[in-house]
Amino acid sequence: MTADLLPVRRALLSVSDKTGLVELATALAARGVELLSTGGTAKAIRDAGLAVKDVADVTGFPEMMDGRVKTLHPMVHGGLLGRSGLDDAVMAEHGIGAIDLLVLNLYPFESVTAKADCSLADAVENIDIGGPAMLRSAAKNFARVAVATDPSQYAELLASLEANNGQLTAATRFAFSVAAFNRVAQYDAAISNYLSAVTATDTAVPVRAEYPAQMNSTFVKVMDLRYGENPHQSGAFYRDLYPVPGTLATFQQLQGKELSYNNLADADAAWECVRQFDAPACVIVKHANPCGVAVGAGNGDAYELAYATDPTSAFGGIIAFNKPLDAATAKVILDRQFVEVLIAPDYEPAALEYAQKKANVRVLRIPHGDGLNNFDNKRVGSGLLLQSSDNRGMTRDELKVVSKLAPTDKQFTDLLFAWKVAKFVKSNAIVYAKDNRTIGVGAGQMSRVYSARIAGIKAADANLVVEGSVMASDAFFPFRDGIDAAAAAGIKAVIQPGGSMRDAEVIAAADEHGLAMVFTGVRHFRH
């Protein structure tokens, strides 16, 4: 049975990150807590004018082997592992004093090995041995011992001591124990991933494989979801341990119903697409496919143009902006259509106030960030597919004109716009665009020519004029039929990767129809 409240009389502090150390030690000393410490931590505490006992004086052994051995001793681990009422006699027999609180963070292995010029020797020297051992001992004995692993926990620790007259609750000790075991697992995973990636050690800086022989990943649960992709499936949302700034996992929900599995999948597609653009842009997504994308003079202009691409599909969609959302645009959207999720880097106060009239609409703020996801993964039966993220951009200078007719400057602008959109449309993907807006989108067809036909049908349904538009294809055209369909619809320029066995036939079709065509040399499959 675990006692609910236990006093803290003796604490061991040993940290590599000195953030908040002196303030914590001062607060503990003010409560009469005896402080034990090691090396640089003890020096920092002494320099603050506080009394502290060196662990070497407790163990009777000096720190040795350049600090590799200092806490691996029964006087330390016995003090952490000793059980009240069970081990009291043994501890008294051997003069082991109980340690009630351990404050410890580990050598900075992750940050050291993140440096491109990190040597294997530096990596190895930053593998903490005594630290994880103490964390495990203290965390295992949460019935009597509390353990803090990060400066972010110090405020909660001190608040709990203050609220309970120098004692810590069982709930606090257990929560800190779980955090400690999680930290040790993360640390060991980082070491395993690093060493598993090392393929050569005969150079000053070891050669590391992009994909380690064994991979360990850590994710933190953000929330449980009402259900998964379908109501009969359960679901939850987890984020990376260290989310990339500017990505979906950094969102703040400002209002609305609980987010669903599909909401989050669609929101990610919409946000990643819209954040490609520098000018004000709007992306409307349905079932993870953009159904309308536009760049405009402002949010309102971009939204109107994106919405006009496919008003039917926009119903119940996810709408994302790359600029702070103004009240006027928010009012137009919410008065016109049913929206599942609104996304923007920020909102005018009046926009949020108006959104409250539609309390079920989920409103997300995702702060701007320049970071990009490095890897994508997909689960398959008992396995994982891992790849580098498709972050490949494209500039005009990289395009190769393969037709007799070269695109005009305006067509080049539209081609690059359509190419950005096509990257986020499920394959086979065809995008018709003109004047920095989508005219029609053909997505997810098994035949590329059918995607081209669907893009034309979508444009006609929305009463949009295809004549003079450009077409983007996420992959090469295996036959000329896609070009024939595009020309019949009124397309005047085409951007595609090239690389088909029938490229000559496809180029000839473009020349026959008087189309300009450029190759990117880059494919954007999306499944």
Curated annotation (Swiss-Prot):
InterPro entries membership: AICAR_Tfase_dup_dom_sf, Cytidine_deaminase-like, MGS-like_dom, MGS-like_dom_sf, PurH-like
Keywords: Hydrolase, Multifunctional enzyme, Purine biosynthesis, Transferase
Annotated GO MF terms: IMP cyclohydrolase activity; phosphoribosylaminoimidazolecarboxamide formyltransferase activity
Pfam family, one: MGS
Gene3D superfamilies, alphabetized: 3.40.140.20, Methylglyoxal synthase-like domain
Domain notes: The IMP cyclohydrolase activity resides in the N-terminal region.
UniProt family annotation: Belongs to the PurH family.
Matches recorded under NCBIfam families: PRK00881.1, purH
Protein name according to UniProt: Bifunctional purine biosynthesis protein PurH
Organism: Stenotrophomonas maltophilia (strain R551-3)
Origin organism lineage: Bacteria, Pseudomonadati, Pseudomonadota, Gammaproteobacteria, Lysobacterales
Gene field: purH
